[in-house]
Amino acid sequence: MTDATPLLGRSLPELQDWVVAQGQPSYRAKQLYQWLYERSIHNLAEISVFPKAWRQSLQAVPVGRSQIVDRSVSPSGSIKYLLRLHDGEIIEAVGIPSGDRLTVCVSSQLGCAMACDFCATGKGGFRRHLAPHEIIDQVLTVQEDWQQRVSNIVFMGMGEPLLNLDAVLAAIRCLNQDIGIGQRGITVSTVGIPGHIRRLAETKRVGDRPLQFTLAVSLHAPNQAIRDRLIPSSRHYPITDLLQECRDYVQITGRRVTFEYILLAGLNDQPEQAEQLAQLLRGFQSHVNLIPCNPIDEVEYQRPSKARVDAFADALRQQRVAVTVRWSKGLGADAACGQLRANRSTATLPA
């Protein structure tokens, strides 16, 4: 019996069902589980503990692993990967080192429909959702290439995670419960989709465990006019409505919300705009990540000076807003926030 659905992403009980359906004893599922998630195999024929005849019959069963077609290293040590999927499409993932930690920035969609004005991914449009195994594979690929255990995952690559929420939650379940990455080390970023933050809050659980990962909302503006310019979809989703959903999320989950704010020189980096932002977030259980703009070819936005960034952060702190400045580490490899877009025209694809 064959099954075209990749095995990567399945839980141990699901693998037990699959193994038994193949006419094998159920204990083989534990072996398969270990080889999938601890040894990160690409083909079932690699499982030496399986009977040879069965291994040979399993060669056509898809595990769900991608192929690295290019890797670019930034001066800071971050590595951007171009990964070829089963259908020939290319996605991007980034490995980001920090001391003894390794963070993976993963994609949740092939392309993105949000078309944010400062982001490279949206310039290429939306092609399709990624399946759970295609998300999980990005983490295993980086972990395997670095020969280092992944400690953190950020859903800040290609795509809008909440528009592919079922697959994202399925991937997080596996990454947490099967691969052993703590939920508190996982961040899911969104520009804000009407009703979807509430839907996420009401989910409450990931698999059989409480929802504990971090929600990061890409706010990027202190008022509706600037947000409409930067994020076209926000024209149908007022900031007041977005923030109310975020407040509901905090109340339902007990988890604070992180707000991402990209600083663009001369547009949203003025002291008075810091005060507007502080007013928006007053009384909110939240944290603000300030991200100085990362340049991309198609837009004219510039990164503010360090003095301007520091002044903006100080203005927020004076208003009792918790804030962190995030200087991107992937600039030299076009792997920083806002720069991810799989470039199939320049990637060297092996025959």
From Swiss-Prot:
Annotated InterPro entries: Aldolase_TIM, Methyltransferase_A, RlmN_N, RNA_MTrfase_RlmN, rRNA_lsu_MTrfase_RlmN/Cfr, rSAM
Residues that, per the record, bind S-adenosyl-L-methionine: 159-160, 189, 218-220, 294
EC category: transferase
Entry note: cofactor: Binds 1 [4Fe-4S] cluster. The cluster is coordinated with 3 cysteines and an exchangeable S-adenosyl-L-methionine.
Reaction catalysed by this enzyme: adenosine(2503) in 23S rRNA + 2 reduced [2Fe-2S]-[ferredoxin] + 2 S-adenosyl-L-methionine = 2-methyladenosine(2503) in 23S rRNA + 5'-deoxyadenosine + L-methionine + 2 oxidized [2Fe-2S]-[ferredoxin] + S-adenosyl-L-homocysteine; adenosine(37) in tRNA + 2 reduced [2Fe-2S]-[ferredoxin] + 2 S-adenosyl-L-methionine = 2-methyladenosine(37) in tRNA + 5'-deoxyadenosine + L-methionine + 2 oxidized [2Fe-2S]-[ferredoxin] + S-adenosyl-L-homocysteine
Domain of life, source organism: Bacteria
Gene Ontology terms, MF aspect: 4 iron, 4 sulfur cluster binding; metal ion binding; rRNA (adenine(2503)-C2-)-methyltransferase activity; rRNA binding; tRNA (adenine(37)-C2)-methyltransferase activity; tRNA binding
One of the protein's GO biological processes: rRNA base methylation
Positions of [4Fe-4S] cluster binding: 112, 116, 119
Cofactor(s), names only, from the UniProt record: [4Fe-4S] cluster
Ligase keyword on record: no
Domain Radical SAM core stretches: 98-334
TM regions (residue ranges): none
Disulfide bridge map: 105-337
Pfam families per the UniProt record, alphabetical: Radical_SAM (PF04055), RlmN_N (PF21016)
Active site: 92, 337
Subcellular location: Cytoplasm
Keywords tagged on the record: 4Fe-4S, Cytoplasm, Disulfide bond, Iron, Iron-sulfur, Metal-binding, Methyltransferase, rRNA processing, S-adenosyl-L-methionine, Transferase, tRNA processing
HAMAP family listed in its UniProt record: RNA_methyltr_RlmN (MF_01849)
Matching NCBIfam families: rRNA_mod_RlmN
Family listed: Belongs to the radical SAM superfamily. RlmN family.
Task of the protein: Specifically methylates position 2 of adenine 2503 in 23S rRNA and position 2 of adenine 37 in tRNAs.
Protein name in UniProt: Probable dual-specificity RNA methyltransferase RlmN
UniProt organism field: Synechococcus sp. (strain ATCC 27144 / PCC 6301 / SAUG 1402/1) (Anacystis nidulans)
